[in-house]
Amino acid sequence: MRFIWLAIIGYLFGSIPWGYIIPKLRGIDIRKVGSGNVGGTNVLRNLGGFWGAITMVLDGFKPFIPIMIAKHTFGVSVSDAMMIGFFAGVGHCYPIWLKFKGGKSVAVSVGTISGTKASLVPVFFAVWLPIVLITQYVSLGSILSLAVITILYFLTDSWQTGIWMLALFLLTTYRHRGNIVRLIRGEERKTDLIAAFTKRNKNKKEG
């Protein structure tokens, strides 16, 4: 019964579509611009770094908040907390409010790491940031960073926690399957982070 409740809580928090809500408040349906993905990277590319960052932070809080409540109120284990994060990832990728068409769970993964093993967050960005700045491939940086973090969970925590992190990593990788194909073909879209955080948003509000 506890498993069911934790899964439901994680899923419902994860289903909050900030990647849709934030652009919509500015008159933009993010599903109709750029890649059409309801995620922080697409928001960043089309609305600029500020709104992209806001979206990513809010997405990160989706697993972080229920994990913190569960840990400090009910004393759940780290593996149970990680399970909440995994189902938040499922909710983010397949939100009930948007006909199960959501994002790719990178920010949710970072939020889960923050809530279960915060010491690994700097490691994530230490891998992610150089890759993205050098290659300009957000997808490549995200997948490789989460791969490193998954290995570290197995090395520094229980195997149960590692399994849930592996499940979250596989979910995120699966959601990036199109990106992986484009990376192999040399067709993946590049994202200049510096430009994204300095350019003015050129999108006009939709009627």
Swiss-Prot record:
It is found in: Cell inner membrane. GO terms for molecular function: acyl-phosphate glycerol-3-phosphate acyltransferase activity. One of its GO terms (biological process) is phospholipid biosynthetic process. It is an enzyme of class 2 (transferase). It comes from the Bacteria. It catalyses: an acyl phosphate + sn-glycerol 3-phosphate = a 1-acyl-sn-glycero-3-phosphate + phosphate. One of its GO terms (cellular component) is plasma membrane. The keyword Nucleotidyltransferase does not apply. The keyword Transmembrane applies. Keywords: Cell inner membrane, Cell membrane, Lipid biosynthesis, Lipid metabolism, Membrane, Phospholipid biosynthesis, Phospholipid metabolism, Transferase, Transmembrane, Transmembrane helix. Its EC number is 2.3.1.275. The chain crosses the membrane at residues 3-23, 50-70, 78-98, 120-140, 151-171. It is a multi-pass membrane protein. InterPro entries: G3P_acylTferase_PlsY (IPR003811). Pathway: Lipid metabolism; phospholipid metabolism. Probably interacts with PlsX. Belongs to the PlsY family. Catalyzes the transfer of an acyl group from acyl-phosphate (acyl-PO(4)) to glycerol-3-phosphate (G3P) to form lysophosphatidic acid (LPA). This enzyme utilizes acyl-phosphate as fatty acyl donor, but not acyl-CoA or acyl-ACP. This is Glycerol-3-phosphate acyltransferase. It comes from Kosmotoga olearia (strain ATCC BAA-1733 / DSM 21960 / TBF 19.5.1). The gene is plsY.
